[in-house]
Amino acid sequence: MAKHVTTREKRRARIRRKISGTELRPRLTIYKSLKHMYAQLVDDVAGKTLVSVATTSKALKGELGDEDKTGAAKKVGEALAKAAKAKGIEQVVFDRNGFDYHGRVEAVAAAAREAGLKF
């Protein structure tokens, strides 16, 4: 039986073959579900997550209030950049994880850039 592979999954695999993160310049990867947004900085060499932020995290839950999904994505980007700065991370490689660079994905990236991360 053939496996069903979506175009997003194909795009994701193609992108992941080309980019990887290191400790000095980790990979900023995002995932979005219908309701939540997740972002993390990954060191692919060591196979470790350095920083992780999501709309489900306790720190952001109280801050979000009645934000729409795009507004919540901006808060995730800001919180991720703040946590990265605290760990001494200035530059990242952006991995949109096969999602279109539009809407919530763009909001996370823009907020992280405004907060000081360099892509």
Swiss-Prot record:
GO MF term set: 5S rRNA binding; structural constituent of ribosome
InterPro entries xrefs: Ribosomal_uL18_bac-type, Ribosomal_uL18_bac/euk
Gene Ontology CC terms, in alphabetical order: cytosolic large ribosomal subunit
Gene Ontology biological process terms from the UniProt entry: translation
Keyword set, alphabetical order: Ribonucleoprotein, Ribosomal protein, RNA-binding, rRNA-binding
HAMAP family the UniProt entry points to: Ribosomal_uL18_B
Family: Belongs to the universal ribosomal protein uL18 family.
Protein function: This is one of the proteins that bind and probably mediate the attachment of the 5S RNA into the large ribosomal subunit, where it forms part of the central protuberance.
Assembly and oligomerization: Part of the 50S ribosomal subunit; part of the 5S rRNA/L5/L18/L25 subcomplex. Contacts the 5S and 23S rRNAs.
Name this polypeptide is given: Large ribosomal subunit protein uL18
Species for this entry: Anaeromyxobacter dehalogenans (strain 2CP-C)
